[in-house]
């Protein structure tokens, strides 16, 4: 029996907030300096512009969105894994795969994640709310049209439950084919 579940992914460190505040403060200081110097004011202003763009990128990628990892049933009754992002009033569905398409789930620390090489022909999706998390889980999927690796930041209990439900969904799919 596959029960529906929704888990809110939490930031596990403050690296993104610190990076945002530092880049934003340096960009403000750089803009202020560009008004008071005569020489290279355009260059200093452009550096400030680049830094403010970086700070906006950090804010929109790591601070503003809230990720939800959902296990639910779709309209046909099939169990699916869904990754949603909520930013303000806007909600976006990033990933929606059948639980029967999940092949395996691996726990990775930061060193293993950096050392991992995604094979050619396999798509990689990262739905991690933390900048440089200590632990992530890599979900390997195989569907009729593509193979993919999905990186999420969830608890070990959620990953084990997701794997258990994927095995149950594959077994139910095999029973329905016979």
Regions found by a protein language model. Give the residues of each.
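Extended, compositionally biased eukaryotic interaction scaffolds
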Residues: 1-4, 53-61
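N-terminal membrane-targeting/pre-transmembrane regions
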Residues: 1-29
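Hydrophobic membrane-targeting alpha-helices
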Residues: 31-32, 58
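Hydrophobic alpha-helical transmembrane segments
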Residues: 32-53
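Conserved beta-hairpin
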Residues: 56-96
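Non-transmembrane, membrane-adjacent beta-strand/coil modules in membrane-associated proteins
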Residues: 85-144
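A membrane-cytosol interface segment of integral membrane proteins
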Residues: 120-178
């Amino acid at each position: 029996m596959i029960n529906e579940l929704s888990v809110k992914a939490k930031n596990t460190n403050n690296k993104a907030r610190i990076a945002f505040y530092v880049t934003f403060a340096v960009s403000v200081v750089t803009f202020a300096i560009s008004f008071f110097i005569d020489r290279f004011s355009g260059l200093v202003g452009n550096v400030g512009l680049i830094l403010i763009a970086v700070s906006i990128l950090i804010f929109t990628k790591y601070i503003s969105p809230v990720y939800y990892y959902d296990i639910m049933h779709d309209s046909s009754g099939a169990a699916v894994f869904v990754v949603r992002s909520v930013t303000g009033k806007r909600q976006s569905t990033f990933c929606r795969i059948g639980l029967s398409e999940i092949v395996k789930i691996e726990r990775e620390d930061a060193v293993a994640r950096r050392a991992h090489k995604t094979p050619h022909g396999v798509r990689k999706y990262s739905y991690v709310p933390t900048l440089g998390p200590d632990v992530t889980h890599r979900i390997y999927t195989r569907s009729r049209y593509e193979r993919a690796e999905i990186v999420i930041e969830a608890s070990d209990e959620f990953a084990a439950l997701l794997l258990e439900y994927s095995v149950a969904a594959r077994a139910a799919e095999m029973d329905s084919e016979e």
